[in-house]
């Protein structure tokens, strides 16, 4: 196996649910050279995560590794071992020790009952015969290595800057107290990026030769994602550690991996050096994955899909992209002046939604429950959304995007400011007027599975708003409306009696879009509505949203932390930071000539293939 840390040969994983038979991984072969990173890419259901679980020995019933060999060589001076020939007890000695894994959602991987110090020291003592105090020392060292805790030297400098009269023993006491306080924090007290660093610290605590990272940055915004990717890359270089990096984001792979392997329906269809595969792909599926990504350097009327390439139509559909926005240089707005459109703007229409000096705050209460002050999630913003346009809303987690969306939908009451919809002041609407407004404003959420009732068939889910608002004369007409909507979003009227769990993630999001359209709204907020989808399904949903907008004259606010997606779908972009508007302008202008350092930071943090390889086509 040369100097490979792992050598996978003819690996086959099958599932036997009830009387069915599914081949999830179909005889794949790959190696990961020592000290290098292999990016494993493909759509949801392609077999990526099952491959990782097979390496870790975690494929559970009804799954089974039915063929193949997995040769693992933690050190170059030790002979390779076929992991599939080891007993469960022997496999446990490698799992978490010489081979470790971090998952997509750290909150579900960490036990909420125990503090992070306990969980890291437990992992250390599971694989090393060390005392509790030594395990604690190692846990602190790992947290410093992943940059959650400052180094001892920095902690010492901070203590002396705060009070230079402290004695050496007092300084040491303060340093130890800071370390202890961090170890005693619980998962719910940390942000998503901090939690992922805790998972990385736990994974590297026993010096693994191979780290498997399964979608570790998918749930993070671009700036936090960039920090985590840089950290993983630095750790691999410093430790000589190999990594299997699983993702559906090809830009992330381009910035992280040395080699890439592409999976499709359980098969490995293409593999090689990262530059070679991404600049000259050979397999139609790889070409499709690359083409269906929204790109910052292109303005397309719609995105190609993977199926275009698998059917041989991709080259025609991607040629000569149509501009969706002709930038006239007019439309750049400051955060202080809401002069959104001039007479020469390329998209002139009447305002649908106008927001004036909006403030939304959450009370921070004192010891007796009285509000002492307010945390301002949205702090004095003003903007206008025009009929038929898409306003992209971007910013880091916690900047106020979702709070703003809920306020516009009248789910949260503002402290100050006014909201006008179709020329009417809706700020304080209640009762019948608010009920009437609900028909005109809808939302599509990020997670389609959690926003659909698992006990209701999709037909009942979509017909529910029609019943509530007493639309159409009878149940037959309502069912016809549901059937039409399902057909319009790319499903079948025959799916009406099926349940959410019977659909894929992309299909469930189409169901949510159909439900949002049921009442013929004028205005829809898409709150991270494609963030949970892989790149090929994302392209299909984005194309669908644009088609529906043209057909029904819809107006969107599209919220996302993926700036390349926002650029593709939006006419204008509004950047939020700490509850305020950084800048607003046409999508083209914002990305070509951002006016604020914060916007430039967001754009620079986007992982793209084009940045890595200077691709011009």
Indicate where each model-derived feature is located.
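ABC ATPase NBD coupling module
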Residues: 77-100, 126, 277-281, 368-372, ...
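Conserved catalytic motifs of ABC-family nucleotide-binding domains
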Residues: 207, 520
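Conserved ABC ATPase signature
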Residues: 159, 186-190, 499-503, 507
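Conserved ABC transporter NBD signature motif
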Residues: 65-81, 417-425
């Amino acid at each position: 196996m040369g100097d490979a840390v792992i050598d996978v040969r003819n690996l086959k994983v099958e599932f036997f649910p009830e009387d069915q038979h599914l081949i999830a991984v179909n005889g794949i072969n790959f190696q990961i050279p020592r000290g290098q990173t292999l990016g494993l890419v493909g759509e949801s259901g392609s077999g990526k995560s099952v491959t990782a679980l097979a390496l870790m020995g975690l494929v559970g019933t009804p799954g089974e590794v039915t063929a193949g060999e997995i040769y693992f060589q933690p050190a170059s001076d030790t002979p390779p071992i076929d992991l599939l020939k080891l007993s469960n007890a022997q496999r446990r000695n490698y799992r978490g020790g010489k081979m470790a894994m971090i998952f997509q959602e750290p909150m579900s991987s960490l036990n909420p009952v125990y503090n992070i110090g306990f969980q890291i020291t437990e992992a250390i003592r599971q694989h090393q015969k060390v005392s509790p105090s030594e395990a604690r020392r190692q846990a602190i060292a790992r947290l410093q290595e992943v940059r959650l805790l400052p180094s001892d030297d920095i902690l010492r400098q901070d203590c002396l800057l705060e009070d230079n009269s402290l004695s050496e023993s007092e300084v040491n006491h303060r340093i130890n107290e800071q370390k202890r306080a961090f170890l005693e924090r619980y998962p719910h007290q940390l942000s998503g990026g901090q939690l992922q660093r805790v998972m990385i610290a736990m994974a590297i605590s026993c010096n693994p030769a191979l780290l498997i990272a399964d979608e570790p940055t998918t749930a993070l915004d671009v700036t936090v994602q960039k920090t985590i990717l840089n950290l993983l890359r630095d750790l691999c270089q410093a430790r000589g550690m190999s990594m299997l990096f699983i993702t559906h984001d090809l830009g992330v792979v381009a910035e992280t991996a040395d080699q890439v392997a592409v999976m499709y329906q359980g098969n490995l269809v293409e593999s090689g050096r990262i530059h070679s595969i991404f600049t000259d792909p050979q397999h139609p599926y790889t070409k499709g994955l690359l083409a269906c990504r929204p790109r910052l350097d292109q303005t397309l009327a719609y995105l190609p899909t993977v199926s275009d390439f698998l059917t041989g139509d991709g080259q025609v559909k991607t040629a000569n992209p149509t501009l969706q926005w002709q930038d006239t240089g007019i439309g750049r707005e400051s955060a202080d002046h809401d002069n959104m459109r001039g007479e020469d703007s390329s998209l002139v229409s009447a305002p649908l939604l106008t927001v004036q000096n909006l403030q939304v705050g959450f009370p921070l209460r004192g010891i007796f429950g009285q509000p002492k002050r307010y945390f301002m999630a949205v702090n004095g913003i003003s903007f206008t959304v025009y009929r038929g346009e898409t306003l992209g809303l971007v910013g880091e987690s916690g900047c106020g995007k979702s709070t703003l969306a809920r306020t516009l939908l009248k789910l949260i009451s503002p402290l100050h400011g006014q909201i006008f919809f179709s020329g009417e002041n809706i700020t304080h609407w209640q009762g019948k007027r608010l009920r009437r407004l609900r028909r005109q404003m809808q939302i599509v959420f990020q997670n389609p599975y959690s926003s659909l009732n698992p006990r209701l068939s999709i037909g009942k889910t979509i017909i529910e708003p029609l019943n509530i608002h007493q639309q159409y004369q009878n149940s037959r007409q309502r069912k016809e409306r549901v059937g039409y909507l399902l057909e319009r979003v790319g499903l079948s009227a025959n799916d009406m009696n099926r349940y959410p769990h019977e659909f894929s993630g992309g299909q469930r999001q189409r169901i949510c879009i159909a439900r949002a359209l049921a009442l013929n709204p004028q205005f829809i907020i898409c709150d991270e509505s494609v963030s949970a989808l892989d790149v090929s399904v994302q392209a299909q949903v984005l194309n669908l949203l644009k088609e529906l907008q043209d057909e029904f004259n819809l107006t969107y606010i599209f919220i996302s932390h993926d700036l390349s997606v926002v650029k593709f779908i939006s006419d204008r972009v509004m950047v939020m930071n700490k509850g305020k508007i950084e800048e607003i302008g046409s999508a083209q202008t914002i990305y070509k000539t951002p006016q604020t350092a914060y916007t430039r930071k967001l754009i620079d943090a986007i992982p793209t293939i084009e940045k890595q390889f200077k691709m011009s086509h």
